[in-house]
Amino acid sequence: MNAESTMFPHIFLALLALISHIEAFNFMPRPSRVINSPKHLKFHINQTRSSYFGYTLVIRQTSIIVGAPRAQSTLESQRTINETGAIYRCSLTNGVCSPYVLDSRGNVDAPYSEYTFDSERKDFQWLGGSMDGGTKDTDKLLVCAPRFYAPSSRDNHLHGVCYWVNNTVASTPQHVTRISPLRLKSEQVKEEDNGNKASFFYIMGELGLSAHVADDNTKFLIGAPGINTWRGSVILYRQVDPVDNPTASRRDTSKALRRTYRDVDSNDYTPEHYAPEIPTPGLWGQEEDSYFGYAVSSGFFDSSNPTKLLYVATAPQANKQSGEAYIFDVRGKSIHKYHVFRGEQFGEYFGYSVLAEDLNGDGKTDVIVSAPQHALEDSHDNGAIYVFINKGFFNFERQILRSPVETMARFGTALSRLGDINHDGYNDVAVGAPFAGNGTVFIYLGSENGLRDQPSQRLDAPSQQPSKYGSHMFGHGLSRGSDIDGNGFNDFAIGAPNAEAVYLYRAYPVVKVHATVKSESREIKPEQEKVKITACYRLSTTSTDKLVQEQELAIRIAMDKQLKRVKFTQTQTNEISFKVNANFGEQCRDFETQVRYSEKDIFTPIDLEMHYELTKKVPDSEEFCETCAIVDPTEPKVSTQNIIFSTGCATDVCTADLQLRSKDVSPTYILGSADTLRLNYEITNIGETAYLPQFNVTSTSRLAFAQVPGNCKVVDAVMVCDLNRGRPLAKGDTDSVTISFDVSQLSGQSLIIHAEVFSTGYEQNPTDNRQTNVIGLKEFTEIDASGGQTNSQIDLEHYSNSAEIVNNYEIKSNGPSVIEQLTVSFYIPIAYKVAGSTAIIPIINVTSLKMQASYDSQLLSIDLYDQNNTMLVVDPVEVTTTLSGGLERTVITQNRQSYDIHTSGHVHQTMEVLDTSMVATASMSRKRRDLKALTANREQYARISNVKAHDLLSDDFKGKLPVNRTIVFNCRDPEMTICVRAEMRVHFRPEKSINLNMRYSVDLNEVNAILVDPWEYFVILTDLKLQKKGDPTSTSFSINRRIEPNIISKHQETGLPIWIIIVSVIGGLLLLSAISYLLYKFGFFNRTKKDELDRLVQQNPVEPEAENLNSGGNN
């Protein structure tokens, strides 16, 4: 109630003045009358702050009842009472106000009563804090003062009080009845919880914080949110038969309670046929401090019993301060809830105001609950209203309308029923936002679906300058809608309590324009040069004023605005404008137009538009225009028609039969195999001519297009192409389209491509106009893995104790697909397990193991794990188990245990290092042990290794190394071998390589001990495994392995001496010479046949004639 605490700084006023108005509807944009707080009256106490004149309003036919809850009294009997509050009756004709006195008594010190507190204190009682009544002078008027209190020797009892009169026909109240049922002493404070808790029952009731008069004038519903420790309740005050009057049955209290309802001014008027019912909130489990009864109303909510009046009241602090509202009926001392509405924001004060009205014309009452402290994002106190549309059987459809302004306007502080202000069959409402600058009121129209989403009109405070009391709070007081000027349309008033003013807004009649434009035919023949256009128009309105029923219209007709193929004969342009007087009767005008035919535009219709509006506008002034009318801004303001060209088809619109099919589309695509994916489509028309045939295509992945043909365009990942170079596609014609998608970034499991063809006409068989291709996407990558030892081969004759082996590996992707995550694992054997023992034989000095990997010029992180899958080194760029200076490093496992790996002696499988004496003992005992036993132990290793030799070596080495003399040391038998695993993860792209450098030291003493006769070669085999994420079976890639193992030989591999080669060559030459000589001696080279032929020729010389003949032939 403290307005000062809610005022905004004046700095916002200049900004608010710049806010553009929503297009005005039928209320005047400025008030027709301003009614100010009366200054001519004599007040006994000076007014030091705003009287809040206009806080509550009840409009009647010729006057308006105005509440000013902080006004000083003009009565002599109340001359010493501060801010009694006042009710004024103000003339709607001249704006003159006079006090409307409901209670002329001052403060009362009543004699002691056994039953009730009868003394009265009216200081700051807020008379007019709530007020309600119908819009006729014959309707009842209910006025309340919620801060009225009764003093006692110990407390002040904030009971509240209300007054009502049967009508306001007379200029002064007649037969005022007071309602004050909370004065019984026995009901002030009650014990609860078996006497362990005291409850403020009636003592702080605040009767009259809200008040409502039912439309039939037979019932009052009054809120008392302070009852029962602010659980709150309502007082239903209604007509009852005398025998049903509960006050008549109360022993010894009937006279005291009857004073509750008696006429203030006369003891002769006792309406005993009215009685209050006060439900006890504890009986239905109302929460403490929930303020039930803060706002009240009534309506016909039950679709199964549409004549039963039910009630609605709010509890803004219920539901953990999110607020609730209930539809209920009063049943004795309790209520029966039919439905519960709830707010959605903590502290939004859901239920500050409530309104019950049928908004969609279905005969069922709907509910609006305001939440003026609803917060928009990054703000507060913006406000909202919750609209609950009654769908029947207490099912409600919720709609939330948030403040149209972003300031802290407290939109929804006041709600009012305006009735059907535009006569469209639906009731409308006003919503106050009194703290939007100086205040704003929004008008919302009802519709078939409830309230429209946007306000039809916004009424700002007439003055943007603050009053002497601050911002005006324009819109905190709203009257109902009432036709005060007799034009058939409801007017209403708005109160601005902090400006101490009431503003009257009259409503203009609403008219509807019915206008059409059409051509004499829907088709234009190619040879046709002229077309006749007809424009028709008329008005309709519910107004009975003859001056309103006829309005001047401004009409503008435009044709073919884009191509301008048509022009009016009269203007020689494609537009014509004129004015006409329209009324209830339809009138028409004809216009002749000239048409220019164009073959290429035959498929483009000629658009025909007629724009119309009232010429006489509502003036932006305080003067009401008696002959003006207004059109609903949501009504159409243009009439349209299209005219087509004749196409030679059987009907006005051609029926084509387009067929679409894709050609040679592969069902699968290997990701990365190409940057573009091409699809070919063929389109055939087997129906009538297809005008403006078009083809569009898109993909579910919204792929970009690699190429856009000249006859195509791309809009939002959809390519649209004009077929047949933009010309019509005749029957039997075929066209084709090639589409190229950019698939360089494509991923996923499948690609779905949708294609469609269409034309401007009808389609005989739409099912074959669409083509959907589902292409399965697969990944495949070919990987080359190669590598081996880069330093010289080790033999035990030239190396002793230990030797370092350096390996380089390269893993390269040959594509085509990218592997999103490839895990590369190297398995490196480091020690043998001794059968039947817990000891192990270390082969590779794990502390010397160093690895460095790079990919695409970037170092890769390497994770190192032991045989128990315990991570030893986490994400280093270089794996090493030695520190600078050659010191041994303690390896920390994930379970925070630590151990050192030593290069000499035997280490237990538990990775616990033996102490020095144990290592020495083990070394000495090994030298003294039985050779037979030692051989047997090595034979056991050799036998296991020999079994796997052929399987574990590559094909190149299977032929080079003797099977029966080679031992293979690898990680494929976890029962015999201890290994470590180096793991890397990489986003593997084609033509990119992983390069790994690995080096470690080998304990040659152990190797030498193992290589007993007949074993000659010790092979260290490092395994490589690749794992692709999402492919546990590794079907989407292949590996070409060329990885060479590390070979340690027992003896040096010697080459063939050069002198042996020279001797062999000489010996070969001598042997060849000897063989050739022997063959010559034995006549192998003699040619006997040739010698015989030569001898025969000599014995038979050629005849001369033949010789001469031969010579003559040559001449």
UniProtKB/Swiss-Prot annotation:
**Which PROSITE patterns would you find in this protein's record?**
FG_GAP, INTEGRIN_ALPHA
Give the GO molecular function terms.
integrin binding; protein heterodimerization activity
Transmembrane spans? 1055-1075
Query: Where are the Extracellular topological domains?
Result: 25-1054
Q: What is the reported phenotype of gene knockout?
A: Flies display impaired olfactory memories within 3 minutes of training. Mutant embryos show reduced level of phagocytosis.
FG-GAP-type repeats, residues: 39-99, 113-174, 193-246, 278-335, 336-397, 398-453, 460-522
Per the record, ranges on the Cytoplasmic side are 1076-1115
Does this UniProt record's set of keywords contain Transmembrane? yes
Q: Which domain of life is it from?
A: Eukaryota
What does the record say about its membrane topology? Single-pass type I membrane protein
Q: Which UniProt keywords apply?
A: Behavior, Cell adhesion, Cell membrane, Cleavage on pair of basic residues, Cytoplasm, Differentiation, Disulfide bond, Glycoprotein, Integrin, Membrane, Oogenesis, Phagocytosis, Receptor, Repeat, Signal, Transmembrane, Transmembrane helix
Chain positions carrying an annotated carbohydrate: N46, N82, N166, N438, N696, N845, N868, N964
Q: In which tissues is it expressed?
A: Expressed in embryonic and larval hemocytes (at protein level). Expressed in tissues undergoing invagination, tissue movement and morphogenesis such as salivary gland, trachea, midgut endoderm, dorsal vessel, midline of the ventral nerve cord, amnioserosa and the amnioproctodeal invagination. Expressed in the mushroom body neuropil, brain areas that contain mushroom body processes in synaptic contact with other neurons. In egg chambers, expressed in border cells, in stretch cells and in dorsal appendage primordia.
Protein location: Apical cell membrane; Lateral cell membrane; Cytoplasm
Any Gene Ontology biological process: dorsal closure
Pfam families given in the database record: FG-GAP, Integrin_A_Ig_1, Integrin_A_Ig_2
Q: Where is the signal peptide?
A: 1-24
Record-stated family: Belongs to the integrin alpha chain family.
Cited PANTHER family: INTEGRIN ALPHA, INTEGRIN ALPHA-PS3-RELATED
User: What does the subunit comment say?
Assistant: Heterodimer of an alpha and a beta subunit. The alpha subunit is composed of a heavy and a light chain linked by a disulfide bond. Interacts with mys/beta-PS and Itgbn.
User: What is this protein for, i.e. what is its function?
Assistant: Integrin alpha-PS3/beta-PS is a receptor for laminin. Also binds to wb. Important during embryogenesis for the development of the trachea, dorsal vessel and salivary gland, as well as for dorsal closure. Required for short-term memory processes. Minor involvement in the establishment of the oocyte anterior-posterior length. Plays a role in timely border cell migration during oogenesis, probably mediated by JNK signaling.
Name by which UniProt lists this protein? Integrin alpha-PS3
Origin organism lineage: Eukaryota, Metazoa, Ecdysozoa, Arthropoda, Hexapoda
